[in-house]
């Protein structure tokens, strides 16, 4: 079989070839999120607030899907590096089984828990109604989301990230096209309002999922997927989640943080909650390229770890840190210089502008530190120590961010709450550096020693 490029191509070119397609596709995804909220904001500010409040559940959905897929991705890449192709195929088969389990979980959430979730955050009936309509569709038809995420990670694990760009971009473009059509009832379609926004999302996910499955079956020759006579393998599932659970927890913690921040901000006004939701949409346009870089280098590091190439692992990390910090620096400049223009895209009222401009400027001060943290998480995950990333995430969002935000809220000035973000990031970076020293001492510096003996 032909040598995999992850073990031979120069690192700088390899990172670009692996990460750039993912970064582009994730940028398109982020653009969709922004466009989606721009259209929803034209319904009403309460509709925008409802979508903002739905984010914790949507983020939890992504956490389960991406976390499981990250485990599959890293395990596939490591097994490919070890040239254990029988295990590669078994991992892929169990991955499909886990997609089904993930969907069933969120089907239950959509059917029974959408309305109680919104009532736990607000007593404004219009927001509850909008939120229930939106979230029920997103959860009950989420099978496309989980299928897309899993099969895209299979492509990434074998270095075929350009196909991931095709599937993600296709889904996002379909979302963007369908949003105004279904929300406002254009071209003879019924006017569905906020339900139309949700419908556009799931339709895009389903089409992208079908495309990802077809590409895997026709182009991904390193993985031979066949479910004939399949039985779940507890050992492989355990190995997948040994890597994936910390990633799931990390992103799920984001849901807890977001829910907690919504509760804190709604005590000031629904506009403050809408501002926070808009910030998350905007920051995704900065964070997604960094996460795309992260997703691209995880299989590179995992492959070279499995192949015993310490030099390539270290060089990949060094390049990743440099690229991620540069990406976040650009985001910092945009948020500092153009906050008013960014907010006006969402039909921002004068009240929203008065709250949103300082929010964007204060929170974005943490972006450089975030870039370094995202880079370090890639080596934690690739080397099977994703639990380190989980500890850092818990410290940042639960131990630091929410308590500090709650404390600052007691002063009665909503603008003080935004300072909780840079404070929490400082704490998390200290932990990240400690874990980096540990992982180099215990794992990285010992890579390849067996081959030298």
Please provide the spans of the model-predicted regions.
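Short alpha-helical transmembrane segments in multi-pass integral membrane proteins
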Residues: 1-19, 76-143, 190-245, 301-366, ...
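Small-residue-rich hydrophobic transmembrane alpha-helices
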Residues: 48-111, 145-164, 275-333, 337-339, ...
């Amino acid at each position: 079989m032909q040598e995999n490029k992850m073990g031979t191509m120069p690192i700088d070119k390899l990172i670009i070839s692996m990460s750039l397609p993912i970064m582009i596709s994730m940028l398109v995804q982020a653009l969709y999120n922004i466009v989606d909220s721009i259209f929803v904001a034209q319904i009403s500010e309460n509709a925008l607030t409802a979508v903002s409040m739905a984010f914790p559940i949507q983020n939890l959905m992504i956490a389960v899907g991406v976390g499981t897929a990250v485990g599959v991705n890293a395990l596939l890449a490591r097994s490919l590096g070890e040239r254990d192709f029988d295990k590669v195929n078994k991992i892929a088969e169990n991955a499909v089984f886990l997609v089904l389990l993930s969907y069933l979980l969120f089907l239950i959430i959509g059917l029974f828990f959408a309305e109680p979730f919104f009532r736990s955050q607000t007593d404004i009936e219009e927001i509850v109604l909008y939120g229930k309509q939106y979230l029920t569709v997103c959860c009950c038809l989420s099978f496309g989301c989980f299928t897309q995420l899993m099969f895209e990670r299979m492509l990434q694990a074998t270095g075929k990230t350009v196909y991931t760009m095709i599937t993600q971009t296709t889904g996002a473009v379909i979302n963007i096209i369908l949003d105004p059509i279904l929300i406002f009832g254009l071209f003879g379609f019924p006017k569905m309002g906020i339900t139309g926004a949700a419908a556009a999302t799931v339709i895009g996910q389903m089409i992208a999922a079908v495309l990802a499955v077809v590409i895997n079956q026709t182009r991904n020759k390193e993985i031979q997927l066949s479910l004939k006579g399949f039985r779940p393998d507890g050992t492989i599932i355990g190995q997948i989640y040994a890597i994936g659970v910390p990633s799931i927890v990390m992103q799920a913690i984001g849901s807890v943080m977001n829910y907690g921040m919504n509760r804190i901000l709604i005590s000031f006004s629904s506009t403050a909650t809408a501002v926070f939701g808009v910030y998350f949409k905007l920051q995704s346009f900065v964070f997604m390229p960094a996460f795309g870089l992260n997703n691209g280098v995880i299989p590179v590091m995992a492959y070279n770890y499995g192949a015993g190439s310490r030099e390539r692992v270290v060089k990949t990390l060094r390049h990743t840190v440099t690229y991620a910090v540069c990406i976040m620096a650009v985001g910092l400049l945009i948020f500092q210089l153009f906050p008013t223009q960014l907010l006006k895209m969402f039909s921002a009222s004068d009240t929203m502008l008065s709250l949103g401009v300082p929010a964007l400027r204060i929170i974005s001060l943490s972006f450089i530190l975030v870039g370094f943290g995202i880079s370090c998480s890639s080596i934690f995950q690739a080397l099977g120590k994703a639990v380190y990333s989980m500890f850092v995430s818990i410290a940042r969002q639960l131990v630091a961010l929410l308590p500090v935000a709650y404390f600052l809220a007691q002063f009665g000035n909503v603008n003080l709450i935004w300072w909780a973000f840079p404070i929490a990031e400082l704490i998390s970076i200290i932990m990240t550096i400690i874990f980096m020293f540990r992982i180099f001492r215990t794992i990285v510096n010992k890579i390849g020693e067996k081959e030298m003996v």
